[in-house]
Amino acid sequence: THSSPNKEHDGLHVARVAQTLNPETLKTELTEAGNESLALEGLARQQGFDTSQQHTAYHDAFTSLKILRIIKDKHKDNWENFLSTSTKNSVETILKSEGIYSIFENVKGKNMMYLVSTLHPDHCFHPSYASWGYLFDLRRDPEPLLNLSVNDLKVYLKKFSPKALRVIKTNKAPVVLDKKFALKEKAYADL
């Protein structure tokens, strides 16, 4: 969590985004399911780093720093954008802007990119969990949903697979990027 004006980010989120945008960013191992693994020890091994003292606080922090330096070097144009959502406020500002943007999630071990839009700037957060923002996945046309009653909408949305609503936790430093990235994905290419 974040307390203003402090900032923090999650290196794993940054690594997932970098690897999703360019699978050549880091050398990775594969999981048993055949997905790229971004486990720190495996990344260290694949980059040729010494892993003899892995799992000590100092060594893991230093390894993370070296991996993030590789990402920064290979993603110079996007590095500042990767870090721009390091506070809850910065993410909430984006969600309230009524824009269209790219978000990234790890779903069943696969890094996924989604083209999403805020539902409504005044009603885009969970009523009980204020840091949960709701976004609409634009692989579906939202137009037919606009005139449904709330109850019909709830029933209709539960039928979608993959799910039509994405949840973004604003206090977990998610990476939110320009829509141009997700528009390259097959699911959104015709928009």
What are these regions (language model features)?
Residues 1-76, 82-85:
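Metal-dependent phosphoesterase core characteristic of DEDDh/y 3'-5' exonuclease domains
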Residues 70-191:
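Acidic two-metal-ion nuclease catalytic site recognized across multiple nuclease folds
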